[in-house]
């Protein structure tokens, strides 16, 4: 298997990663306002494609649709319309998250999309740095991580969601759904949701793969040893992690990551089935 994805991450990439994260929040806010709503909020996510991180199609009230694409190789967010027109907002100009989102809002307005945007989702006045070479390298991470997640996802049958990049966390993941149902109160209403297990990559700080069962049944899980240095996580949030640097540059890294995901599911499955 190719080892490209598992090349070591450089801590000097963080300013550019943080910029991409800030700009993705603006993209996500536009998708939230205009995409066809999905009950699991999948409409606000981005999908990994060879040419970037792409929104769902955003319907234009007068007809047609628009999509936004974060082009990490071309260093811009491209706004493409079904009528053949396109525009872009460069990510290299040092704009704050607020300024960048406002530029995107103006661009989609020119395509016929106007609405009320949740500005708290993207307002950020931090000056932004952007290194094109780092952005290209990070795109490679997303593309190859997407492949690994899709390989795992393909083994799990029909009860899975798509692989998605989430603007709020700038992580990449999918979810598998069990048959156990959990009830809890939200907004004064009792809702039922299926138990679930995610699998993803968080690329910030000390980057890590994660796989988190919900509900997390510590008594059943914490005594199970995970492979390849992976460990259960109980501080701050509950789940499991396999740190990226534990497998980086290892020729067997992809296999080890997939074995980690399988081991978590094997341990958690009895707790997720009704």
Residue spans for each PLM region:
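Secondary-structure boundary elements
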Residues: 106-117, 144-159, 218, 269-272
């Amino acid at each position: 298997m190719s080892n490209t994805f598992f090349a070591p991450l450089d801590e000097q990439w963080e300013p550019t990663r943080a910029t991409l994260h800030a700009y993705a929040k603006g993209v996500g806010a536009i998708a939230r306002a205009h995409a066809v709503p999905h009950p699991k909020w999948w409409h606000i996510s981005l999908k990994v494609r060879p040419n970037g991180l792409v929104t769902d199609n955003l319907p234009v009230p007068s007809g047609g649709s628009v999509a936004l694409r974060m082009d990490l190789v071309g260093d811009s967010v491209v706004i493409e319309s079904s009528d053949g027109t396109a525009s872009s907002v460069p990510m290299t100009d040092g704009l704050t998250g607020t300024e960048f989102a406002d530029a995107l809002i103006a661009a989609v307005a020119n395509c016929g999309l106007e609405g009320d945007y949740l500005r708290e989702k993207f307002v950020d006045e931090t000056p932004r740095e952007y290194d094109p070479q780092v952005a290209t390298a990070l795109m490679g991470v997303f593309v190859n991580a997407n492949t690994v997640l899709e390989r795992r996802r393909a083994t799990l049958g029909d009860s899975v969601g798509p692989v998605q990049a989430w603007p709020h966390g700038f992580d990449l993941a999918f979810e598998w759904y069990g048959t156990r149902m959990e009830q809890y109160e939200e907004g004064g209403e009792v809702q039922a949701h299926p138990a679930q297990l995610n699998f993803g990559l968080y690329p910030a700080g000390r980057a890590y793969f994660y796989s988190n069962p919900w509900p997390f049944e510590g008594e059943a899980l914490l005594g199970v040893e995970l492979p390849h240095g992976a460990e259960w996580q109980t501080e701050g949030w509950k789940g499991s992690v396999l740190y990226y640097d534990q497998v980086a540059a290892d020729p067997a890294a992809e296999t080890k990551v997939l074995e980690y995901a399988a081991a978590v599911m094997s341990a958690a499955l009895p707790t997720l089935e009704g």
